[in-house]
Amino acid sequence: MTYTSGTAPNILQIIPRLDGGGAEATTLEMTKALTAAGGRSVVVSEGGKLSEAIIAAGGEIINAPVASKNPYIIYKNINRLAQIAKEQNIDILHARSRAPAWSSLWAAQKIGKPYLATYHSKVHDSPKLKILYNSVMTRGERVIANSEFTAARIGIVHKIAPEKIDIVPRGCDPTRFDPMHILDADIKKQRAAWRVEENEFVILCPARLTRWKGQMVLLEAVAGLKGNFRLILTGDTRDKTGEESRFAKELKARAFETGLSEKLVFAGHVANMPLAYAVADLAVLPSLDPEPFGRTAVEAQAATLPVIVSDAGGFRETVKEEDALSDSSTNRTGWRVSPGDVDALTDKLQTVANL
């Protein structure tokens, strides 16, 4: 069926939680687009920080235990989602994560509605059981990939024909991230909150606080920097139990060992990322594994920040380093370094700090 502005679809988006992350941000953006087109976005999740934003954008929230990987809960969710879809007059069930995707697929089959999924996460190629579990993301009418890199991985790992895969790169609203829209008073207040001193070079790592995002590598690289700087790490320092995570403790211990404790700020969850980018002089995304897309690199560039990213995955599609050190900025959007290469990262950090 082809939809027009007069027949925009009612979409059921199923996502485990609505906290910070690329999949969650895309759920909000889809809600805005559907509402603007005259359709409806009904989001089934266990709630989170973005729930209010989705409602404000015209979406509807239905709470259900769709984050669970318990087979019994997944089975129970089949009827639950089928009932929701019928009651809400849903046209398409759109899964955004693997656990609820199985329930979504079977619910769609039960009521005779189309099912599709967006592959936001890494496409694992082992073990075989994990590949089978993840294959639910490719069993619908279509599969949406967030980058050419992800699309290629889907084809290789899941043996999916290219014509079944739609590549829809993530993005951002450049107006929202334009630093000209940020008040100087707000920047000054945020700098004070993060203990940023005058003339400090502010390095921001806008990522979840988890090992594969590479914060430890960044900490080691910053330890070799010369000059006056401040390192800001975003992301919740607590684990699912509410206690300080093991990784956060390791970062703090290493910062103490390298003498960086006074230079390091754990910012926690940051709701106002445009303001965070406005405070920073540089954004660094040193992921150890290839990012499927890497939305924060796009956001940072929209905020006119120079970026340093890992030379892998989706970053290769969004961060171009041709002529990076020339006077011309025609082709330059940032710098890429090999994942995990501390010395190379230190060198690039020093290069940008000296510009």
Where in the sequence are the language-model features?
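A short, active-site helix/loop in glycosyltransferases that binds the activated sugar's phosphate group
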Residues: 140-167, 172-177
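Short His-centered aromatic/hydrophobic patch
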Residues: 95-101, 119
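Short hydrophobic beta-strand element within catalytic cores of glycosyltransferases
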Residues: 43, 306-309, 316-320, 326-328
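A conserved, positively charged/aromatic
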Residues: 109, 115-145, 152
